[in-house]
């Protein structure tokens, strides 16, 4: 029987008014049953009415359910009021911390600027923040906010555009309160008082934490643990959404970082990202994004560990048989593997995770899940803090529980492939390569460097190679849209680290060509710039080692492959040049036409690559003099073997002042008042001394041997203090670990000026940057003998 028209209209209007009241009603003191459907529902149940106290299986956690129009749940304002005793304005309550008149900005005030803040009397106690209509006795209470350890306070900050007042925001579980005051001191006083009250509260525990404690207490009884999982779906795999985090996260409306939502909302988003892994075609980028979120927000790391333990437990408890048969379920184990190689879980979460892995191994000993569990348990014992999240290549290797291959370039020995994992350090890779190349008994020290063209930087021994590879991947992604260049692309290389000892090198080993190629690379970069006669002698020795004896028909490399580029001449101030007469311009145009100039430039550009020794000797001009001198020195080396030429090259290069010195840009901080602003300098670390010079100059302004360094210590994150005699020098540089390693290597190297028994203290935790000593005076040249002296005549 159809309803009468009037009754039908009344029912529709009533439903419409209900919706309007929900959407546009008083949002501060009223609510609807559906309004808080995203909040979690926690229940503490007892197995029997006669039970006294909480037993190990008494806690039951259920997911929220959507309630109908008529709900037995408390409305949001009723829930808030039910926690506060009904009483009027307290007169002399000893629990009152601070009270006074403040303005309260209405909810959504930023979106509704036409609503002005309302003035009210606020009272802060040890339990709540209460709002009253007035300060008199019997005033009506307008609202209360229960304060717990999860509440947060932000501010004070001045809202110039909205109200012009100083505001302090207190965030609770259901809503937030923004208190405003025209005076900054008043806002700061309330902010400090609110933070002190919140800090004095005992930490809250979620029901999930209580369940973890029960599982830990019942770990010796598998049946009890299985019963806990059976009665609490929150611990098991689910395909539904998670409406609240598993761990206590602070309430708050402000984002913890750019591009992020509040922590509790980000925790729910993480769970959605985990569920998206099951059907992702390319899970690597999604996994990397989840790991990056945990790196940016450390508070979510334990939360994600628990979510992964939940999703790897199976729908029927740990471990679920459907999870072992579903290939998509392996994605959770793969992400858990990456997490265990990147972050360290907290104490309680770590214990629960280890127990979960052990139960998986015992239940499915020969399955792939057991292999993942064993791999994760080993990784948790070795993982320490990482600077960057794993690269896509590392994520792919970890998903298969395999090692990652990295390529290290060794001068004179080609490229070496080294198998690493997420915990391998640069020092371990350097030691493996030193042993593989037969350099274990060498007097020279070697280290791993990152290199790109002429740029290079030593890696500290404790640096994780996986972090370096991730940085290379990020830099390559940033430069993907840029034009490719010959020097684009970072790589790892093994290099000499410290002073060079060319004596006693075996002609049949890898060390001689290794040092030979590295010394030549340093000379091509102008580190150091030796005299011209030494450069020509070195070029002749390199030709002898590469081409053997001189022959006029041997194709030669270009001069820029043998000699460093000439130093740019100093620019003199421009002088006005007289304007030539028109006749001179006409004559120049007739003798030097643009077409002739173009042809001569093209001929000069082609001239270097395909020239032979005979053609170079017949050329004239400025560059031909250097080429002729190089060829003359090469002719005098007839009969010298390749190994002998390389050894002579190293011996001559080691005699150059400042050979192998490292250069770093530093900032000098004056220790005396009134000395002005800090100045930029170059710190040079040589084999015998360290020096300071101005950028672009070759002569040092300060030079001191290591034996005269009285103290060398770290004064800050990037500040180094050097004390020589009565003077102290403060230098600032970001390359702390590199300089610390290099200076310690030089201090450990015995020298006539600083014997092994020298009492100069080693550098401890010092940060430094050193410039290549491109100036004489860092090391004094030693005498030359044999064929080395003949080459420079």
UniProtKB/Swiss-Prot annotation:
Signal peptide position in this chain?
1-18
Instruction: List residues, modification Phosphoserine.
Output: 30
Name residues in a coiled coil: none
Q: Give the CC-aspect GO terms.
A: cytoskeleton; extracellular space
List, as start-end ranges, the regions of compositional bias called Low complexity.
Answer: 750-762
Where are the residues of the annotated region Disordered? 28-62, 554-586, 598-622, 750-793
- Carrying Omega-N-methylarginine, the residues are 638, 642
**Residue ranges of every copy of the PH domain listed in the record:** 95-199
Q: Where is the composition biased (Acidic residues)?
A: 29-41
Name of this chain's protein: Pleckstrin homology domain-containing family H member 3
Where along the chain is composition biased (Basic residues)? Answer: 598-608
- Domain MyTH4, chain residue ranges per copy: 237-399
In this chain, composition skew of type Polar residues spans 782-793
Residues forming the FERM domain are 404-754
Q: Which UniProt keywords apply?
A: Methylation, Phosphoprotein, Signal
Q: Which Pfam families match?
A: FERM_M, MyTH4, RA_2
């Amino acid at each position: 029987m159809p309803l009468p028209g009037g009754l039908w209209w009344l029912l529709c209007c009533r439903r419409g008014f209900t919706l309007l009241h929900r959407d546009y009603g008083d949002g501060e003191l009223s609510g609807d049953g559906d309004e808080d459907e995203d909040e979690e529902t926690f229940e503490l149940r007892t197995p029997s009415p006669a039970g006294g106290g909480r037993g190990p299986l008494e806690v039951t956690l259920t997911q929220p359910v959507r309630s109908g129009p008529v709900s037995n749940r408390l409305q949001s304002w009723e829930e808030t009021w039910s926690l506060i005793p009904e009483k009027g304005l307290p007169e002399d309550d000893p629990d009152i911390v601070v009270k006074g008149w403040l303005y309260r900005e209405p909810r959504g005030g930023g979106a509704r600027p036409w609503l002005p803040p309302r003035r009210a009397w606020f009272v802060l106690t040890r339990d709540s923040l209460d709002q009253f209509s007035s300060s008199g006795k019997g005033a009506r209470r307008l609202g209360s906010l229960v304060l717990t350890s999860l509440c947060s306070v932000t501010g004070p900050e001045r809202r110039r555009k909205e109200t012009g007042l100083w505001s302090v925001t207190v965030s609770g579980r259901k809503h937030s309160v923004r208190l405003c005051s025209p005076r900054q001191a008043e806002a700061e006083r309330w902010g400090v008082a609110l933070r002190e009250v919140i800090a004095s509260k005992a930490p809250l525990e979620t029901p999930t934490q209580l369940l973890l404690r029960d599982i830990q207490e019942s770990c010796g009884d598998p049946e009890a643990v299985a019963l806990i999982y059976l009665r609490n779906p929150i611990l098991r795999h689910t395909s539904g959404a998670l409406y609240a985090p598993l761990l206590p996260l602070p309430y708050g409306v402000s984002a913890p970082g750019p591009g992020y939502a509040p922590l509790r909302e980000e925790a729910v988003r993480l769970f959605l990202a985990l569920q998206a892994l099951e059907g992702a075609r390319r899970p690597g980028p999604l996994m990397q994004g989840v790991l990056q979120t945990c790196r940016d927000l450390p508070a979510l790391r334990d939360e994600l560990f628990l979510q992964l333990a939940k999703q790897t437990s199976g729908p029927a408890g740990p471990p679920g048989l459907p999870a072992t048969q579903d290939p998509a379920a392996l994605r959770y184990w793969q992400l858990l593997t990456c997490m265990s190689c990147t972050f360290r879980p907290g104490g309680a979460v770590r214990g629960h995770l280890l127990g979960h892995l052990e139960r998986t191994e015992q239940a499915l000993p020969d399955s792939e899940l057991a292999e993942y569990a064993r791999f994760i348990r080993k990784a948790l014992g070795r993982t320490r803090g990482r600077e960057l999240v794993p690269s896509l290549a590392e994520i792919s290797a970890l998903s298969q529980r395999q090692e990652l291959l990295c390529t290290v370039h060794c001068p004179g020995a080609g490229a070496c492939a080294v198998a690493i994992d997420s915990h391998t350090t640069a020092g371990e890779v350097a030691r493996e390569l030193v042993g593989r190349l037969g350099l274990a008994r060498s007097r020279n020290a070697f280290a791993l460097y990152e290199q790109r063209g002429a740029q290079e930087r030593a890696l500290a021994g404790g640096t994780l190679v996986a972090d370096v590879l991730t940085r290379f991947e990020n830099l390559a992604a940033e430069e993907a849209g840029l034009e490719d260049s010959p020097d684009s692309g970072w790589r790892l290389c093994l290099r000499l680290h410290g002073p060079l000892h060319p004596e006693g090198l075996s002609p049949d080993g890898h060390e001689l060509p290794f040092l030979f190629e590295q010394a030549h690379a340093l000379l091509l970069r102008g580190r150091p710039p030796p005299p011209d006669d030494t450069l020509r002698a070195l070029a002749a020795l390199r030709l002898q080692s590469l081409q053997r004896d001189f022959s006029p028909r041997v194709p030669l490399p270009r001069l820029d492959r043998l000699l460093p580029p000439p130093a740019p001449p100093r620019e003199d101030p421009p002088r006005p040049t007289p304007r030539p007469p028109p006749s001179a311009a006409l004559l120049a145009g007739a003798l030097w036409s643009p077409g002739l100039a173009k042809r001569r430039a093209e001929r000069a550009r082609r001239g270097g690559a395909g020239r032979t020794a005979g053609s170079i000797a017949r050329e004239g001009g400025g560059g031909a003099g250097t080429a002729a001198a190089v060829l003359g020195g090469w002719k005098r080396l007839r009969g010298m073997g390749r190994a002998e030429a390389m050894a002579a090259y190293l011996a001559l290069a080691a005699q150059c002042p400042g050979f192998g010195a490292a250069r770093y840009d530093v900032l000098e901080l004056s220790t005396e008042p009134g000395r002005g602003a800090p100045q930029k300098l170059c710190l040079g670390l040589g084999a015998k001394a360290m020096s300071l010079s101005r950028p672009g100059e070759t002569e040092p302004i300060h030079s001191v041997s290591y034996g005269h360094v009285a103290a060398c210590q770290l004064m800050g994150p990037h500040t180094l203090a050097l004390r020589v005699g009565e003077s102290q020098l403060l230098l600032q540089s970001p390359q702390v670990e590199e300089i610390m390693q290099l200076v310690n290597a030089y201090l450990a190297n015995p020298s006539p000026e600083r014997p092994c028994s020298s009492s100069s203290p080693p550098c401890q935790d010092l940060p430094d940057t050193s410039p290549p000593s491109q100036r004489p005076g860092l090391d004094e040249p030693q005498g030359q003998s044999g064929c080395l002296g003949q080459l420079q005549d």
